[in-house]
């Protein structure tokens, strides 16, 4: 297969797909370990590479298991932290809070969600999406 025929995900095409109306917004992103590009780069790194050109990345949010899968055991809550390299908050949505609080959303203009799910009712990711949408109303 030639390089030109490779599958590209929307994450791989952000510069051409990012809406002009959202240019330079303060962005938060809800991500998990399967949030990756076609080259298997985690979405947080892809988003950071566009920080300051398409949007301003201000916060990350992680569901059950954490945004990078740091808590793989089932039903293990985790606490938020400050990203050690980017100095932005990484909020836990599977700890003290299950949905973003007004304080977490303060200063954000948009919340991007990139989480794959199998569609089974016992998976928590679909509920995390719902709770994020409700918090952003």
Say what each PLM segment does:
Residues 117-129:
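Glycine/threonine-rich flexible loop motifs
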Residues 6-56:
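N-terminal phosphate-binding or glycine-rich loops at protein starts, especially the Walker A/P-loop
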Residues 25, 108-109:
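Short, well-ordered alpha-helix to beta-strand connector turns
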Residues 56-67:
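Short internal beta-strands
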Residues 43-50, 128-136:
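Catalytic-core regions built around general acid/base machinery
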Residues 35, 66, 116-119:
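Short glycine-rich anion-binding loops that position phosphate/pyrophosphate groups of nucleotides
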Residues 73-108, 120:
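Glycine-rich oxoanion-binding loops at beta->alpha junctions
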